[in-house]
Amino acid sequence: MTTISDLPEDVVEEILPRVPLTSLSAVRSICKTWNTLSKNRVLCKAAVKKQFLGFIMMDYRVCSMKFHLRNDEGGDLVDDLSIKQVGILDQIEISEVLHCDGLLLFVTKDNSSLVVWNPYLGQTRLIQPSNNFHCSDRYAIGYDNNRNLKILRNFSDYGSSGSNKRGVSFKGNTYILAQGKIRVDSRWKIEAILLSFDFTTERFGPRLQLPFGFYYPQDLFSLSCVREEQLVVLHQSWMVSGELEIWITNKIDPGVVSWTKFLRSISCCRISIQAGSFFINEENQVAVVFDLDEYKGSETCRNQTAYIIGQDEYFKSVNIGEAPNLGRPEKYAPHIYCRPLVCSSYVPSLVPLQINQPDTRKESDD
């Protein structure tokens, strides 16, 4: 009797690339041959190209998120949205998630440790601090010229524009939004800038220009990337209600950057400066921004929401789940809700993690 493990290797290589990334663990358990093939090469490229796959933090839990992006004229741009909690991490409450070249870095909610995870290989690694972690710590992840994974901790002196303080990993370096002062007509003005941290030299590079210049403290800024090929920046002006712009790099080096406008909308709702994580799809000219639903002023229940923004003022909100009510910080203050946080679109990696070995990677402090 022929079994599935008896299939010729060329047939198996036709089957495996069609498997969704989130189903690989089940596929690997079928037989040793399938397990070996899936860990020696990335087999999900076909599926990844046809759908968005990312990871989102909801209710302090890590979830996988996937959906298909469509370009049907007059129809919905997003189809088959699926969000599932990651079983291997269901015992860990997470307050932050960062992505670098197929690896994810999590900060635990109690700030007791960091967790690095390779979703494709199914490997995790716990990192204990050399000094106690603190709730105000900020983190970035990258690698040096020898592909050694490194974590940057505490760069709070480099003030972030707005409240979105997360860095984005791009080709091994980390890029963060920051602010600088410039003198104009005998007055100091605040400008938004981009800084890069080189994990080989362990130094910040020169200031890089953003496409908007001066800004108000209430403006929303957020960084993302496209498969670690291009950086993307989102800006929503506090002064112009509903206006949102997204720019994408057409050139980026350690000392120079140039931008092209990707999308502009005047129909978008106001996104909180405490939220605004997002991703884009170039082929379909669409952006998806994550926040809570619009505040109505009196309700005690709000939903975590994906806002889909497209060409010709296409705008749609999609409810992705009820937001936990975290209570009031003060008696007459409004309720605080847990906001969704998404990392950039995920690309599988064959980089193994050093499991159960002492942590020898350098922890950088500034």
Swiss-Prot record:
Residues 1-51 form the F-box domain. SUPFAM superfamilies: F-box domain. Pfam families: F-box, FBA_1. It comes from the Eukaryota. InterPro entries: A_thaliana_F-box, F-box-assoc_dom_typ1, F-box-assoc_interact_dom, F-box-like_dom_sf, F-box_dom. PANTHER family: F-BOX ASSOCIATED DOMAIN-CONTAINING PROTEIN, OS09G0372900 PROTEIN-RELATED. This is Putative F-box protein At3g13624. It comes from Arabidopsis thaliana (Mouse-ear cress).
